[in-house]
């Protein structure tokens, strides 16, 4: 079966024990590793967590494939590595970037990666690395990331993610997550593509606890979609690239690694439409903490402290009375990397545009720019809708170090601090 078919089917749910077969009877019944698997397939286990994790935390999937993954020659380190591999010295300064320019030369997803910031080497079971991707051609090779799971946030152009477990098609305002070690290929459906990636080195992403919100709200499990089995039975030479401790290594295969005919388990790629997010907000006064906008979280061993939170700022009604409605001025223990998929962000009147990004590190003061602040103080507080917008945030408890490439790109705004420079004191001790 070829993965180029446009008709894609999905399975609904988050964290489910899924199962799928592209040929009838390809899944063994009642056991995982029979002496002879159906259709002459090989059984292979992909573990996303340690064997002895609590059952509620365990992630693993059984694959029934044409050729075992173990059949490959030695990997060799590629001469061309990911841009931004070298991190710069930590900086407390606030940083903001214009959209990165799309490539002029033929560039696939891998060649178009730029690491923007990171807070941990890949040999640590925690932390996050943040990238932007820029591409103008589909991959003719396959890739897997041994360093972490990948959260993809498209900003421009639709992608088809052809994975070992099947295909996902994602567009701007949708996201996709690829498990650590899952082989995949990125195909471009619109000629050019740009977007953001969080590489999660820590615990796998999961839905946040809802607490007093109750049993419904935010991102609902049924809106997450996993693929169905689709396989390639190809004997053409193909390059397989892996990312290992931050470096790219490759080997040449004599077959397609996307040859899984059937599978079952819960360590799966998935997609989610951000437009399905059930936004929670105040119906009385004050601006709630932005944690109410959390889509996915990777926890740490400290309860309530995230390795990374993925947070969105979607279209929503603003109805708070006697309230400064934009996100307030803030100094945060957490480190915030923001991007904009479409529209405008309500705390920035200008300078933060779709495809751009910003980084506010631990305790770096930030908040609405002067123009947004003045408008909010003088606003008529009638209910109004913030529409046609989608900003997001990768928030992590560990300090992010920008890469040298991110600091040297012409897209870096050297005048970012100026957006707060015209804030003036309005204090008057004689007038309350």
From Swiss-Prot:
Its cofactor is Fe cation. The keyword Transmembrane does not apply. Fe cation binds at residues 330, 336, 366. Pathway: Amino-acid degradation; L-phenylalanine degradation; acetoacetate and fumarate from L-phenylalanine: step 4/6. The keyword Transcription does not apply. Homogentisate binds at residues 345, 366. It is an enzyme of class 1 (oxidoreductase). Keywords: Dioxygenase, Iron, Metal-binding, Oxidoreductase, Phenylalanine catabolism, Tyrosine catabolism. It catalyses: homogentisate + O2 = 4-maleylacetoacetate + H(+). CDD domains: cupin_HGO_N. GO terms for cellular component: cytoplasm. One of its GO terms (molecular function) is iron ion binding. Its EC number is 1.13.11.5. It holds the Pfam family HgmA_C. The active site is at 287 (proton acceptor). GO terms for biological process: L-phenylalanine catabolic process; tyrosine catabolic process. It comes from the Bacteria. Coiled coil: none annotated. InterPro entries: HgmA_C (IPR046451), HgmA_N (IPR046452), Homogentis_dOase (IPR005708), Homogentis_dOase_bac (IPR022950), RmlC-like_jellyroll (IPR014710), RmlC_Cupin_sf (IPR011051). Belongs to the homogentisate dioxygenase family. Involved in the catabolism of homogentisate (2,5-dihydroxyphenylacetate or 2,5-OH-PhAc), a central intermediate in the degradation of phenylalanine and tyrosine. Catalyzes the oxidative ring cleavage of the aromatic ring of homogentisate to yield maleylacetoacetate. This is Homogentisate 1,2-dioxygenase. It comes from Pseudomonas paraeruginosa (strain DSM 24068 / PA7) (Pseudomonas aeruginosa (strain PA7)).
């Amino acid at each position: 079966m070829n993965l180029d078919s446009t008709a894609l089917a999905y399975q609904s749910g988050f964290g489910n024990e899924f199962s799928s077969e592209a040929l009838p009877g390809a899944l063994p019944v009642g056991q995982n590793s029979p002496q002879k698997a159906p259709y002459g397939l090989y059984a292979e286990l992909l573990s996303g967590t340690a064997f002895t994790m609590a059952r509620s935390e365990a992630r693993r999937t059984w694959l029934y494939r044409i050729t075992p993954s173990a059949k490959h020659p030695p990997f060799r380190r590629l001469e061309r590595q990911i841009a931004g591999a070298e991190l710069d010295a930590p900086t407390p300064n606030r940083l903001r970037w214009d959209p990165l320019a799309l490539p002029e030369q033929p560039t696939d997803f891998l060649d178009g990666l730029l690491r923007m910031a990171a807070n941990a080497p890949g040999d640590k079971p925690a932390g996050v690395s943040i990238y932007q991707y820029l591409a103008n051609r589909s991959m003719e090779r396959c890739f897997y990331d041994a360093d972490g799971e990948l959260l993809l946030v498209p900003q421009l152009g639709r992608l088809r993610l052809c994975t070992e477990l099947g295909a996902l098609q994602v567009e701007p305002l949708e996201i996709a997550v690829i498990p650590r070690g899952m082989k995949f290929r990125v195909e471009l459906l619109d000629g050019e593509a740009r977007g953001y990636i969080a590489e999660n080195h820590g615990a796998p992403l999961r839905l946040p606890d809802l607490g007093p919100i109750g049993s419904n709200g935010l991102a609902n499990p049924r809106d997450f979609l996993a693929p169905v089995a689709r396989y390639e039975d190809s004997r053409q030479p193909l390059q397989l690239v892996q990312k290992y401790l931050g470096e790219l290594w490759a080997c040449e295969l004599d077959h397609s690694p996307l040859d899984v005919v059937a599978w079952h388990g819960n360590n799966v790629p998935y997609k989610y439409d951000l437009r399905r997010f059930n936004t929670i907000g105040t119906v009385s006064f004050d601006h709630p903490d932005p944690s109410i906008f959390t889509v996915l979280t990777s926890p740490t061993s400290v309860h309530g402290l995230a390795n990374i939170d993925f947070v969105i700022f979607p279209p929503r009604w603003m109805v708070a009375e006697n309230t400064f409605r934009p996100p307030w001025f803030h100094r945060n223990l957490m480190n915030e990397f923001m991007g904009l998929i479409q529209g405008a962000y309500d705390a920035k009147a200008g300078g933060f545009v779709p495809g751009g990004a910003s980084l506010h590190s631990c305790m770096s003061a930030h908040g609405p720019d002067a123009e947004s602040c003045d408008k909010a103080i003088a606003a008529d507080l009638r209910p109004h809708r913030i529409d046609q917008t989608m900003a997001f945030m990768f928030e992590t408890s560990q300090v992010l170090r920008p890469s040298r490439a991110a600091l040297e790109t012409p897209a870096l705004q050297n005048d970012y601090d100026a957006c707060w420079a015209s804030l003036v004191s309005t204090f008057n001790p004689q007038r309350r």
